[in-house]
Amino acid sequence: MGRDTVAEIITSIRNADMDKKRVVRITSTNITENIVKILLREGFIENARKHRENNKYFLVLTLRHRRNRKGPHRNIFNLKRISRPGLRIYANSQRIPRILGGMGIVIFSTSRGIMTDREARLEGIGGEILCYIW
């Protein structure tokens, strides 16, 4: 069985967010690095750094949390895996979905690399829908 690195990064971030952890360590691949760059640029995570341990590279992510101590903990963002190894989901440039009317983002894997839905609309290309973030 192969490993689904996109599902692993989404699950790790979601579990750390629900457990109120501030730091997450995930394995570093080209796909995860590109997704983390998008999350940094869009403001969903505070910081990311590359860490090497026993000839393996890891990404250490610092998550954004509310600093208010009163009231219940609220998850800062939600992530949902859409296309998976058993069922690939594609969208052309005319059928790119909008999440919460443009408040969330869709991460695409295109022929020009991994990008958000806004970038794919501007370039007029479609691709595989990796995940929704809102």
Curated annotation (Swiss-Prot):
Chief location bin: plastid
GO cellular component: chloroplast; ribonucleoprotein complex; ribosome
Keyword Acyltransferase annotated: no
Signal peptide region: none
Short name of one Pfam family: Ribosomal_S8
Alphabetic keyword roster: Chloroplast, Plastid, Ribonucleoprotein, Ribosomal protein, RNA-binding, rRNA-binding
GO function terms (MF aspect): rRNA binding; structural constituent of ribosome
Gene3D superfamilies per record: 3.30.1370.30, 3.30.1490.10
Compartments reported by the entry: Plastid, Chloroplast
Gene Ontology biological-process entries: translation
Record text on subunit structure and interactions: Part of the 30S ribosomal subunit.
Recorded family membership: Belongs to the universal ribosomal protein uS8 family.
Alphabetized NCBIfam families for the sequence: PRK00136.1
Entries under HAMAP family matching the protein: Ribosomal_uS8_B
Protein function: One of the primary rRNA binding proteins, it binds directly to 16S rRNA central domain where it helps coordinate assembly of the platform of the 30S subunit.
Protein's recorded name: Small ribosomal subunit protein uS8c
Gene name in the database record: rps8
